[in-house]
Amino acid sequence: MDRRKFLFGAAGVAAAAQGGAAFARVPAAYDWGVSPPRGTRDAFVEWMVRNRGEDPRFLGERWDRLQQLISHQDVWDEADIRAYLMTPREDFVTAENLDRAYEWHHLNIGFGVTITGPHTVARMTNTLAVRRSDRVLEIGTGSGYQSAYLSNLTPNVFSIEIIPPLAQRTRALYDRLIAEGYSEYRAIRTRNADGYYGWEEYAPFDKIIVTCGIDHIPPPLLQQLTPDGIMVIPVGPPGAQHVIKAVKRRAPDGSVSVVRSDIYGGAIIPFVPFTGTHAS
C-alpha cells in the first residue's frame, strides 16, 4: 500500500491503521493561510489524514513530540509550530530508523552524517525568526528535513550539501515528494558545493542556518548575510559546539559587527563536523 494514501474522516483514521481500502491522494495545492487544528491530538490527526493523506501513527507521534517541544521552549512562535506540524519527519529518516523518526536523538542517515533531533531543529529554526519574505540559506542539506521545515515558513529556501551522493539522494527525495503532492518543496533550491563559501549567486540572505559544527563563523557567510540578518550556527571544537545566534550589525560608517548569543545558555550541543577545504 502506498504510504501516502489514507482514508477520509475520523472513521478513516482508525480504519487506515487497520489497512482500510478507500484512499485519498494528497492535494497538490498548498495554502499558506491554512493550518491544522491544535485543539486536540485527535482533531489534528483527523485533519491531517483528510487534508494531507499522512499516516495517523506518525501524525500522533508528531503531535506528542510537539507538546514536549513547547514545554521545553524549543518552539514558541505560531508560524514555526505550524511549520513543524506540516513537515513529515518520517519521510527524511532511513528505513531502519523509521520507527525512531520522532525520537529526541540525532539519527544516522549514512555518509557519516545525521538528521538533527527534532528539538534542536525546532529551536534553531525558531531562533531564526523567519518571515514569509525572507531568503534563507541552509548549509548542510543532509536528510532534507531542515529545508522542508523551512519551506513551510518561506518560499525562498536555498540549501547546500558538500557530499555528492547525499546531495543527489536528497534532491531526488524532494522531487518524489513534490510529485506526491508536497508542492511547497518546489521552493527549495539545492546545490552540491562547499557550503563554506555560501551561494553568492542568490545572496544576500536574510537568514542563514548551519547544520554542522565549525570553530569559527565563515567570513563568506557573514558577507552574504543582510544587515540585521540572523545566522544560527554551531561553533566550537569537534563534538563540543555551542549553538550561536549571530546578528550582523552595520554601523553608519559602514563597519560591521556581530552580536552573538548562545541559544542554549552555554550548554554543549554536538554536531557532525563541517567538511571542506576551510573546515577548521
Task: Describe each PLM feature range.
Residues 22-24:
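Boundary at the C-terminal end of the N-terminal hydrophobic targeting segment
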Residues 129-250:
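Conserved nucleotide-cofactor-binding alpha/beta core module
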Residues 11, 85-89, 226:
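Short amphipathic alpha-helical surface patches that mediate protein-protein
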Residues 236-280:
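Active-site capping/gating segments
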Residues 26-132, 267:
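Class I SAM-dependent transferase core
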Residues 1-13:
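N-terminal secretory signal peptides and thylakoid transit peptides that target proteins
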